[in-house]
Amino acid sequence: MLSLSSTQIVLVRKQFGQKMSLNGKTVIVTGASRGIGAATAEEFARKGATVVLVAQDERKLSQLSKKIGSTARVHVLNIAKFKQMEKMFATTLREFGKVDIVINNAGTISPIKKLMDISIDDWNHVIDVNLKGVFYGIKLAIPSMLQNGGGTFLTLSSGAAHNPLEAWSHYCTSKAAVNMLVRCVDLEYRQLGIRSIGLSPGTVATNMQREIKKSQVNQVSKLEWSAHIDPKWPAKALLWLASYPGNEYLGKEVSLRDEALRRRIGMT
């Protein structure tokens, strides 16, 4: 596995600092209207970042933007549409000149159906959002990151990337592919100062878990609501991974089920 050079480590320290100040940094958060995305946007904004909020729910994005204040920007779009993503990046780069961090959070699991029952369009839609949407965000950010000496991609993964689950073929497949994409970014661009890390948050108390619960398919739907963690915890983990200590996990997927990691982040 490649490692950051001493020069690049100094650069990362300057970019983000061991005390994690994000003043002057531009952070794009997809799926920012609710759940992990909204909590992450707030967490990064509190550290001084300008946060670009990306999702399809205009009302919720507007509410979040007002809560965060003047350092938030709203872009209502479908991340599965390359042209829409391209326009958002162009607007962001015109205003701020660079993109420092991309949080690839947006994802879908709907509809929850077995292989024989799911339509081609529905299966493709999950792949388009969960995989292609992540690829688009990475592809569009890399030129700016290279021009400005580096940057960070933090991508939401899932235990479903490693374990087949009934009626989740689209979701499991997309998350497994995303994990490999995280590794490919690391292989191709780490030596140029770009950091790529995946985070598997475990089960989180979000709307997606409500969909899963309603389906009553496979063991995940049978979990008690109290088993799901608050979205603030993955948000805190993402902030920590964006900082200098996260360099230990470059090119890897880390899991919040790891007790040692939780202790390091301060979750226990």
Model segments located where?
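Conserved glycine-rich cofactor-binding loop
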Residues: 33-34
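C-terminal helical subdomain
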Residues: 198-199, 215-264
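Substrate-binding pocket helix/loop in short-chain dehydrogenase/reductase
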Residues: 113-115, 122-124
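Active-site helix of classical SDR
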Residues: 138, 174
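Conserved glycine-rich Rossmann-like NAD(P)H-binding loop of the short-chain dehydrogenase/reductase
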Residues: 47-63
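Residue(s) in the substrate-gating loop at a strand-loop-helix junction
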Residues: 158
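Active-site-adjacent segment of SDR/Rossmann-fold oxidoreductases
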Residues: 163, 184-194
